[in-house]
Amino acid sequence: MKNKIKKIAAIATVVVMVAALAAVFAACDNNEGNEGSVRVVYYADGAAVQAALAAGVIDYGIVGEPAATAGASKGFSVVMDLQAEYADATGNESGFPMSSTFVKGSLAANKTFVDALLAVLEENVTYITENAASMTQLLQGAGSTSAYPAASIPRCNVGVYPAASVKADVNDMLNVLNDVDNVPDSVYYDETQATEQGNGSGVLQLYVPDGAPALAVAKLIAEEGTLTVAGYTIEVNIVPANTIAAHIAKGDGDIVIMPANGGANLIANGADYKFLCSNTRGILYMISTSEGSVSPEDLAGKTVGCIGQNAVPQYAFERILTANGLVTEK
């Protein structure tokens, strides 16, 4: 009887040891599976990313400016410049086009109007630099819910980047994010197809998403009621980012500023607009609740919260991960 009990005890011990070893091997397998992968969770905006980071739901967060700089007052630190990592990954030192200006086809046909609009957008770049300290007050007065610290303005990379200069990048985005292989040239504004039609009159509706894109039209907001563009008064509407595409889809925006690939994809699918220019290039930063710096290799096995699913942030981050031998978890 005693021998039988000893035998049973021995078997039980072996079973426990095997189970323990199996658990160890399983853990090793899981760690190996995570060695080259990064879990990416997408959020609607920078505020949601920051909330998830503060709650410990994610390890790192990717947000745009001005949220990255404004986050310092909430205990967040910038640990990675995605523009620098993108340049290393792709060899493209000029960054990636983000928010872009789309105009109705009828307006794009009038070179007088387009030239006047581009001139105002160029003047705006100087305006926001000279008035950086007042951007929060100005834009919040127009409906923005974002803060625009003066230090963030240069990092928002606001400019006027003509369609021809960003076309190749946008086409690649459309291929990667929207499965569009052949983007028609007709998506982009072509001044040779426009004619001088003189000044017009009336009020045009411009829609722009909250955040850095609104900086591109700060001068129009500041001088609304006095500044005209080729005879037109332009009324600026700052709206939530997740509603911006509807203003091209419905056609109620005469001018719409939205993510480069999103607007181009709508035009490729029949919307009567032209891609005029990009307004911001590369404004993405990775933030953390800890100070220091993080490399792409450090992200293996981590969870990263990111804005912009199916938009430029996803495109840029995946390009960086791929170049560093990492993949996103499905």
Describe the role of every protein-language-model region.
Residues 144-148, 182-183, 271, 326:
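Helix N-cap/coil-helix junction residues
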Residues 30-45, 52-66, 75-85, 200-330:
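Short, glycine-/small- and polar/acidic-enriched structural segments
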Residues 46-137, 260-262, 291, 330:
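Pocket-lining segment of extracytoplasmic ligand-binding domains
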Residues 42, 46, 61, 91-96, ...:
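Solvent-exposed, acidic/flexible segments
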Residues 2, 6, 23-34, 150-235:
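N-terminal hydrophobic or amphipathic helices and topogenic motifs
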Residues 108-179:
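Secondary-structure end/capping motifs
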Residues 6-18, 26:
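Sec-dependent N-terminal signal peptides
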Residues 72, 140, 178, 267, ...:
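Short polybasic/polar patches that bind polyanions
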